[in-house]
Amino acid sequence: MGNREMEELIPLVNRLQDAFSALGQSCLLELPQIAVVGGQSAGKSSVLENFVGRDFLPRGSGIVTRRPLVLQLVTSKAEYAEFLHCKGKKFTDFDEVRLEIEAETDRVTGMNKGISSIPINLRVYSPHVLNLTLIDLPGITKVPVGDQPPDIEYQIREMIMQFITRENCLILAVTPANTDLANSDALKLAKEVDPQGLRTIGVITKLDLMDEGTDARDVLENKLLPLRRGYVGVVNRSQKDIDGKKDIKAAMLAERKFFLSHPAYRHIADRMGTPHLQKVLNQQLTNHIRDTLPNFRNKLQGQLLSIEHEVEAYKNFKPEDPTRKTKALLQMVQQFAVDFEKRIEGSGDQVDTLELSGGAKINRIFHERFPFEIVKMEFNEKELRREISYAIKNIHGIRTGLFTPDMAFEAIVKKQIVKLKGPSLKSVDLVIQELINTVKKCTKKLANFPRLCEETERIVANHIREREGKTKDQVLLLIDIQVSYINTNHEDFIGFANAQQRSSQVHKKTTVGNQGTNLPPSRQIVIRKGWLTISNIGIMKGGSKGYWFVLTAESLSWYKDDEEKEKKYMLPLDNLKVRDVEKSFMSSKHIFALFNTEQRNVYKDYRFLELACDSQEDVDSWKASLLRAGVYPDKSVAENDENGQAENFSMDPQLERQVETIRNLVDSYMSIINKCIRDLIPKTIMHLMINNVKDFINSELLAQLYSSEDQNTLMEESAEQAQRRDEMLRMYQALKEALGIIGDISTATVSTPAPPPVDDSWIQHSRRSPPPSPTTQRRPTLSAPLARPTSGRGPAPAIPSPGPHSGAPPVPFRPGPLPPFPSSSDSFGAPPQVPSRPTRAPPSVPSRRPPPSPTRPTIIRPLESSLLD
């Protein structure tokens, strides 16, 4: 390859790519595309070939490039080419690449000059290129030939615009030196899509083919028709050179010789030629790379900060240290104990806001689930009265009793107390499950050491199972203690006298636990507050709507909002029951309903009041609160109602009074027992289970771990953890290295600032006014006689320059003395113009040029507007 400037950029980009590859990421460094735009046979393909440094594009007269060629350069160790339409086939001979381009063009467009917008995609892999995209476009033409359509100009224009409108596309506006620059379609198109001129570089070709005695010095010096980034002159190989197999390297030497030997260009030879064009383009690539570095730097610094804390822990990791495993084991067990205690006892720091902790769930078991299970088992009033009746009758036997037998009371009470074993044991099971779940969550931090995690779970779970048996034995013992002696002398027990008084009441409301006879004087104590949705209100009446509900021992009220200022309704709890409602597949809400046992409307004209919650846990919690207020669940009774009604109907008034008396006594005594059990069971579980497990973890877990397995086995890291640690450390180093490389690139490269804007309005003017002739915009060489101006065809050629650095643009030809030059508002920094002197002939060519002097600054003065129109 012949692009030395590109080869200097390759190491920088490769270092950046390598740094990102070490991170396992792709470096999204999208370098600009380079598109060549110009008329037919302007030398576009030759410019592109010279930039790449390879001969691979078709050549000839007329329209040769008839389809866009999208050339992707890919950095690779091997050098070959691939076509998208020939997948899998590698071209190592670039003459074959040229033939394939011609064949593929003819396949789509035909053999008779047809064109197509379907691009040919070619990839060239080489160690001497950057990852760039170059685009060779068809030449701009106006008259169709051969098979070309009538709107050939429009089609080619649209084809070109598809590529050059992209912001990351550098535009090489190619114009031959032997044509009129003011009519350059390439410059006009570039101006449309790049009005600021930041992406456009003018390229003047065929300087060696200009008419004898003319040159393009004023154009190349950016004086005549200025562009923001100026012009670069190049000399491409002729068809004769190509046929003679003249390579690009030899062509560049000939080009260099041309500019150094030509009298009009030798003073700007260092800014002319293909090498300088390569330098300009590669400088734009360098600018682009430097512009992308801040984003890369910010991205890498963010990643570095995110892993820095974790890497700090790994930095002190010394696998060869024999004390490391002992220290790590001790720290792990201590951390596990702290985490377990925080999850059970609660903690103010690092509070989980997404789910309840183990301690919070156990609290719900103690104060919501356990009371709910107790109340659920004793709500069957009809069954209880039947049992009391049977007990009284069986105690009396064949005799007719005159008094209420206290043995019937004891028998019924003992049977009811024994029923408490089920809810009590169930609460133990629920607490055990939560403890095990808490242990599993705490051992997640031990996952880096699989054997340690497994052994910790096993040892703690075994201890919990051991305590399970002792806790359940103690719970059963508490129940048996209550059964063993019925204390009718308890201060809260109503006694027979009060029971008989209460039996005279027709309507009695059953109470729950300690909400029975020992209620406070005010029954307006709030049991629960919260948001609920009344879901069974029809759409015509407003539809489902959320309200703020307040539950007391006497009523259920709801308000518009939680400020409790606007009360919507108050529902008394008398004769109310609660039941579940099947969840609708159309709704995500969980619903329960309240209804009246006497078939009365609960709310307005509704028999049921359906209330919706967001979760089943909320439903269970509200049902437990309603139970505390005396609202029982509805449960279909499977007894034979007819027999029960017959027996009730057959009871004599005395037996009925005795049943009612014992029922009141049982209710009073069971409220005492329930209060006691609800208080003692949580305390028993807390003492024998939860506190014991905490003490075991703090005092004995470490010793059992040491005795269970070898320490080295316990502290053996998982393969995943070792890999993660290595990856973290590697990524940390790679990030630091990448940041260093970015810093090196920023230091080693220099951004070239964009040139100041110029007045390029001549591109628009050229559409409205007649353009100057090609001959008048080319100046004569210093050895040629002064050309005669053509009247009415624009400005005359400029006078010869007295020195290499004092050239002036053309001067208007006017007889007689000239008036002083008016000051122009155009400010594009052109050198001053030299007035003509009619009193004497123009100076001849000096035989010796004065050497360029740095002490002679060039005075810059605006051009006359008349020279541009």
UniProtKB/Swiss-Prot annotation:
Any one Gene Ontology cellular component term annotated for this protein: cytoplasm
Annotated segments matching region G3 motif: 136-139
Positions with biased composition (Pro residues): 797-822, 832-855
Catalytic activity: GTP + H2O = GDP + phosphate + H(+)
Keyword Hydrolase belongs to the record: yes
Keywords from the named record: Acetylation, Cytoplasm, Cytoskeleton, Endocytosis, GTP-binding, Hydrolase, Microtubule, Motor protein, Nucleotide-binding, Phosphoprotein
Domain PH positions: 515-621
Alphabetized SMART domains for the sequence: DYNc, GED, PH
Source species: Homo sapiens (Human)
G5 motif: annotated span: 235-238
Location of region: Disordered: 747-869
EC number(s) from the headed UniProt entry: 3.6.5.5
Phosphoserine found at: S769, S773, S853
Protein name: Dynamin-3
Domain Dynamin-type G: 28-294
Positions with a binding annotation for GTP: 38-46, 205-211, 236-239
Residue numbers of N6-acetyllysine PTMs: K299, K604
Residue numbers of Phosphotyrosine PTMs: Y231, Y603
